[in-house]
């Protein structure tokens, strides 16, 4: 999940600066979850459900948001030094607003996954990425 929140000098977090996951209302969504470093837990508090994220294993969460609104999300697994900074927002919007938001991301060149170079544990045994080989 990474560090999502950047506190100010007094330790306060400006929630408007957190990353926001946009979801279309009344449309089934499937989220693919995996971890780049340690076990995390993807939690959207008002959805009353969380899903664990593991290294080297994809986990899926399928659901249908039924109410437009803004919701808080966070990592629910004590995962390390910056655990309390792993915060995000969720915005459930109309299908038209969702499509418009996706178009704005694409126009800005924001498509696809984050580069694998950001994987902290890309040399785990069995991944085939070790510089010394997997012998």
Predicted regions and their residues:
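Non-transmembrane, membrane-proximal soluble domains of secreted or membrane proteins
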Residues: 1-135
């Amino acid at each position: 999940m990474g560090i999502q929140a950047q506190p100010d000098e007094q330790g306060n977090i400006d929630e408007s600066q957190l990353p926001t996951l946009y979801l279309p209302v009344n449309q089934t969504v499937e989220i693919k979850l995996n971890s780049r470093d340690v076990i995390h837990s993807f939690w959207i508090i008002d959805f009353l459900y969380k899903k664990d994220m593991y290294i080297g294993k994809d986990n899926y969460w399928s659901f249908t948001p039924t109410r437009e609104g803004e919701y808080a999300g966070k990592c629910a697994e004590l995962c390390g030094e910056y655990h309390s900074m792993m915060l995000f927002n969720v915005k459930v919007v109309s299908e038209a607003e969702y499509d418009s938001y996706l178009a704005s991301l694409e126009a800005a060149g924001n498509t696809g996954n984050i580069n694998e170079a950001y994987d902290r544990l890309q040399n785990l045994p069995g991944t085939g990425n070790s510089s010394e080989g997997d012998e």
